[in-house]
């Protein structure tokens, strides 16, 4: 499956905080390759390719929930594979067991899938033609014990050497014990009687008797009261034993070299194991992120009928969950007749968060991640995502906020089209309200005419009116409790929002004469328009709250009925 990847600009990543999501995802990945892969993760816009990635994640989460699923632990075989390509190379003990454990896990996964009725076509495609094969496991077991010791049966030569070592040690122990008993009886030994150094048993002789003991002096205690002597009868036996240990070491190296050579013949299989482990590590990281964000898989299609239900801002949800604070989900819909949604309402009412919620979830989904929305949500795919969010000043180019935003707007208008998703916060701000509002109106018409989809936030009354008069656009507002003068952080599509400018001013105790003077300074039409929006939104909010309260009561009654 071919797919063209969109290169999301750094500004879009930063403004939508996609980089923070990727940082969380990177923290769950164990593979250095996957960490790098995550840092450069971009969005996909081939529905077939995207759905394949989402299928893999969904199937992985499904089978992973089974208690019999083989526990995944990342195994880095990169160095092993590089060594196996070098002639006469010898793997270390840890590297052999990395191959061993990888073989066990891959074969356990195959066994699990073969013996369960899970429908996992995407996972099976990921595994490819890897078949259950225990050769590598059994070959390593012929050499190593479960406790990582080299088996004596690994070769006839090693078996013989170890028998000789055992016999020689028995002789040595016998001679040493006899010698120690003899000198102990004569009273030549210190209370500790014996010591051990460099693999050799030594007599702990009181220094005053050192010349009476036959053997080779190996050292003295710090006080020089004890002299450590290797008994004469043991010297030749220790040399023979040391020689046998060297023979054992050489034979073990030969065995491991042969084993390495045997594994090299199966390099392709080991590479396939590692590729699968890398992919599962990536899936596991995405699965852990999904659990952290309480994320789901929405429906994805090439259709532009979009219905996003109960969408949370992923990062806000994580932060609020830590603090035990409720996060309010948002709903929004788009189709061919409603392509652009313009959100208005008071400051600190949640407009910007709502806009970022839809933008960030869109990026995450197209990057192959699950998102915190209701699973019955339907989403589409966009080739480009454009943003203009926040107070951006280009100090290097000496551009004011407004100049910068005009430059961004120019770029958006030049590059956007039917397959674009546009997100603009505080649309038209940064200049004189009357002039900025008029220019914003023209920009708005251009955005709508481009065929793009988008979410915009604004304070401008003329934009709210223009939206109402535009065929492919729709107003939306953030609900507000005008009694308590508190934002409800809930988006409602279908009506513009009031700024609640004078209501908030009264709430903070601003004198009424100042408020009335400010109202009198406004054009009569502006005051009437704002009052109309205010009263309409007030009724709408009251109705919304009443519906929610009724729903709670109904659910409570249903719960009681089932007790």
Question: Which stretches of residues belong to each language-model region?
Answer:
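Conserved amphipathic alpha-helical "coupling/scaffold" segments
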Residues: 1-157, 161, 266, 273-279, ...
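Short, positively charged
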Residues: 1-33, 203-216, 489-524
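Extended, charged alpha-helical coiled-coil/arm scaffolds that mediate oligomerization and mechanical coupling
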Residues: 79-82, 118-191, 220-282
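Long, charged, glycine-rich C-terminal linkers/tails
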Residues: 180-197, 287-310, 374, 474
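SMC-family hinge/dimerization module
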Residues: 197-228, 238, 301-329
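Phosphate-binding P-loop/Walker A region and its immediate neighborhood
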Residues: 261-320
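ATPase nucleotide-binding head domains, primarily ABC-like/P-loop NTPase cores
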Residues: 294, 301-552
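Conserved small/polar residues in nucleotide/adenosyl-binding loops
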Residues: 561-563
């Amino acid at each position: 499956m071919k797919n063209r990847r969109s290169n999301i600009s750094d500004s879009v990543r930063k403004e939508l905080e996609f980089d923070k999501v990727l940082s969380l995802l990177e923290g769950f990945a164990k593979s250095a390759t996957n960490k790098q892969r995550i840092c450069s993760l971009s969005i996909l816009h081939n529905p077939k390719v995207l759905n394949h990635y989402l299928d893999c994640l969904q199937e992985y989460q499904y089978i992973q929930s089974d208690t019999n699923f083989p526990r995944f632990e990342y195994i880095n075989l990169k160095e092993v594979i590089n060594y196996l390509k070098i002639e006469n190379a010898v793997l270390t003990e840890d590297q052999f067991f990395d191959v061993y454990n990888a073989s066990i896990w891959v074969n356990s996964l195959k066994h699990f899938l073969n013996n369960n009725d899970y429908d996992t076509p995407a996972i099976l495609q990921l595994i490819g033609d890897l078949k259950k094969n225990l050769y590598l496991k059994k070959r390593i077991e012929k050499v190593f014990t479960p406790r990582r010791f080299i088996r004596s049966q690994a070769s006839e030569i090693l078996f013989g050497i170890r028998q000789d070592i055992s016999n020689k040690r028995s002789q040595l122990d016998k001679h040493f014990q006899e010698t120690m008993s003899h000198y102990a009886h004569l009273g030549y030994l210190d209370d500790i009687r014996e010591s051990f150094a460099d693999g050799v048993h030594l007599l702990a002789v009181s220094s005053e008797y050192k010349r009476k003991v036959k053997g080779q002096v190996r050292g003295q205690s710090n006080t020089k009261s004890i002299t450590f002597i290797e008994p004469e009868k043991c010297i030749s036996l220790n040399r023979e034993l040391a020689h046998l240990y060297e023979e054992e070491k050489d034979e073990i190296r030969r065995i491991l070299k042969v084993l390495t050579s045997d594994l090299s013949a199966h390099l392709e299989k080991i590479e396939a194991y590692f590729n699968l482990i890398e992919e599962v590590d990536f899936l596991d990281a995405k699965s852990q992120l999904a659990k952290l964000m309480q994320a789901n898989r929405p429906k994805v299609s090439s259709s532009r009928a979009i219905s996003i239900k109960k969408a949370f801002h992923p990062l806000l949800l994580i932060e609020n969950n830590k603090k035990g604070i409720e996060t309010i989900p948002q709903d929004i819909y788009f189709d061919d007749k409603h392509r652009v949604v313009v959100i208005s309402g008071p400051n600190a009412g949640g407009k910007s968060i709502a806009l970022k919620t839809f933008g960030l979830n869109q990026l995450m989904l197209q990057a192959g991640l699950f998102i915190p929305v209701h699973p019955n949500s339907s989403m589409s795919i966009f080739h480009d995502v454009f943003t203009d969010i926040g107070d951006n000043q280009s100090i290097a180019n000496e551009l004011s906020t407004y100049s910068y935003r005009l430059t961004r707007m120019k770029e958006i208008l030049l590059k956007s089209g039917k397959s674009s998703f546009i997100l603009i916060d505080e649309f038209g701000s940064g200049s004189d309200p009357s002039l900025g509002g008029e220019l914003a109106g023209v920009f708005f018409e251009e955005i709508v005419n481009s065929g793009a989809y988008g979410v915009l936030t604004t304070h401008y009354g003329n934009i709210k009116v223009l939206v109402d008069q535009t065929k492919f656009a729709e107003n939306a507002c953030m609900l507000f409790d005008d009694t308590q003068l508190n934002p409800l952080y809930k988006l409602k599509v279908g009506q513009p929002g009031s700024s609640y400018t004078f209501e908030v001013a009264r709430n903070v105790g601003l004198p009424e004469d100042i408020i009335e003077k400010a109202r009198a300074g406004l054009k009569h039409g502006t005051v009437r328009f704002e009052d109309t929006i205010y009263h309409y939104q007030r009724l709408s909010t009251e109705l919304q709250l009443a519906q929610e309260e009724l729903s709670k009561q109904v659910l409570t009654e249903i719960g009681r009925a089932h007790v």
